[in-house]
Amino acid sequence: MKPTVWHHLRLCPHGHPDETLDDAAIAVDETGTIVWLGAFSALPHGYAHWQREDLHGAWVTPGLVDCHTHLVYGGTRADEFAQRLAGVSYEEIARQGGGIVSTVRATRAADETTLFVQAAARLQPLLAEGVSAIEIKSGYGLDLASERKMLRVARQLGERFPVSVYTTFLGAHALPPEYAGRADEYIDEVCERMLPTLADEGLVDAVDVFCERIGFSLAQTERVFEAATRRGLPVKLHAEQLSNAGGTALAARYRALSADHLEFLDEAGIEAMKAAGTVAVLLPGAYYFIRETQLPPIELLRKHGVPIALATDHNPGTSPLESLLLTLNMGCTLFRMTVPEVLQGVTRHAAAALGRADRHGALEIGRQADFAVWSVGSLAELAYWIGRPLCEQVVRGGATVFRRMNG
């Protein structure tokens, strides 16, 4: 790759629209590393003969980060969507053997190639919106072989597409049918066999649990957290989505990277998150899709200064969403978040929710040049437009990996 100066751009280096620089430039060396950024008029003479790319006044932000997805799975749950429209609740569907378990059956039946092809089709719309880092959870296998299959596919996506993929083992997502009535025994399997094996195979970056009355108890969640901690793995938690089960306080005790959903989070849980440095990941796509009415406590999160991230929560049952930009709009319209909050929610704070704030979410000297180029007049348009293609170009490590074709 030739050293390149990207110039005549409007720079938003940290994802905050109040911290910008007009007519800026970014110098990227042959390794894809940012070696200088600032006002184009102040470009040092040493870069005068580098290759130039004129962005004609376009906005540049850090590559976006989708910090909570379930992108790898088999089948769809369109039939359950119809059930919910007829008045059947998400919890009722789950108790009838639908919900997560129906996707488990489809995922177990699919081979790696099928799962890869299906997941790749879901990933590509996100890449075309400037996503350069993404978390992908397991949790639709619920046995060792199937969880391994999911995590292997996630790793393959990161190898074959220009995106950093971070894997999360979510073996404690639901109780598999063969363990009906034996939840503690299943947690034994998760902690003593599945997690150690998959971690030893290098397939796990973090560990998550679905802590809820239709998921796993606080005691069971803590067992998984203990097992993860013994392996030196960070933890995350699906928490307080359907009720206040106290999961967030537990997550904070283990200094979780994030607690996610949080519609029923209380102030005590928020205070614990703040003290632990745990990021609040809000998922408006799921809130919208299952027609929830309990809003997450945005004002209390603001009051206590808890960093807020946003993510698609792409999954087949409650958020079949393939647009992080639409997620921004939902964060504003449904949760009344501000434009600066949602933009930081998919850059700096989303990177922190993955424990990767040193690698993603900001443009700084010494970092890899991962950025998105936007054809908008103001950054507010990223959250304003619905369905309009706004990303003109995506750069990874200084190389253009996506360019929108006009006409």
Curated annotation (Swiss-Prot):
Protein name stated in the entry: Imidazolonepropionase
Enzyme class: hydrolase
First-listed, main subcellular location of the protein, grouped into a coarse class: cytoplasm
GO molecular function terms attached to this record: imidazolonepropionase activity; iron ion binding; zinc ion binding
HAMAP family the record matches: HutI
Function text: Catalyzes the hydrolytic cleavage of the carbon-nitrogen bond in imidazolone-5-propanoate to yield N-formimidoyl-L-glutamate. It is the third step in the universal histidine degradation pathway.
GO term, biological process aspect, one: L-histidine catabolic process to glutamate and formamide
Record-listed N-formimidoyl-L-glutamate binding positions: 140, 315, 317
Swiss-Prot/TrEMBL catalytic activity: 4-imidazolone-5-propanoate + H2O = N-formimidoyl-L-glutamate
Residues that hold Zn(2+) according to the record: 68, 70, 238, 313
A GO CC term assigned to this protein in UniProt: cytoplasm
Assigned protein family: Belongs to the metallo-dependent hydrolases superfamily. HutI family.
Cofactors, names only: Zn(2+); Fe(3+)
Chain residues that bind 4-imidazolone-5-propanoate: 77, 140, 173, 241, 318
CDD domains on file: Imidazolone-5PH
Domain of life: Bacteria
Compartmental location: Cytoplasm
Cofactor remark: Binds 1 zinc or iron ion per subunit.
This protein's pathway: Amino-acid degradation; L-histidine degradation into L-glutamate; N-formimidoyl-L-glutamate from L-histidine: step 3/3
E.C. code: 3.5.2.7
Keyword entries, A-Z: Cytoplasm, Histidine metabolism, Hydrolase, Iron, Metal-binding, Zinc
Binding residue positions for Fe(3+): 68, 70, 238, 313
